[in-house]
């Protein structure tokens, strides 16, 4: 009876681990999808801003520095995720794992919002400058604002 009880205890303990892993996997998948979106936002916006004649070389350098900082923070988030995923091979309490995943999720969501806001502000600045120069249609076409 004791042997059977121990067997079932071990079995249920493993089931709890699997359940936790599956729940964490969904969050990790969401984080990775947001990271991919952020990289795509950066690549698309940066390609457009480099073509935009309404920005000076100094402004483009400033933008690149901002993007570099955002990407560096993104890498830190990925490092934290790897730590959590690798923690399945070692011991880490589920509460600690969940705490790290939640923190990374919050960071990535905020970084994605910040990047979208930064891109939007730069597009608006270009539109403002274009309207002052009478080049509004050029900028609208560049940023797909009119079809």
What are the residue ranges of the model-derived segments?
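Extended amphipathic alpha-helical interaction segments
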Residues: 35-102
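Residues in flexible loops and secondary-structure boundaries
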Residues: 9, 16, 23, 57, ...
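N-terminal Sec/ER secretory leader and immediately downstream segment
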Residues: 1-35
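Long amphipathic all-alpha helical oligomerization modules
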Residues: 82-147
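A structural signal for well-ordered alpha-helices, especially hydrophobic packing surfaces
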Residues: 19, 43-46, 71-78, 108, ...
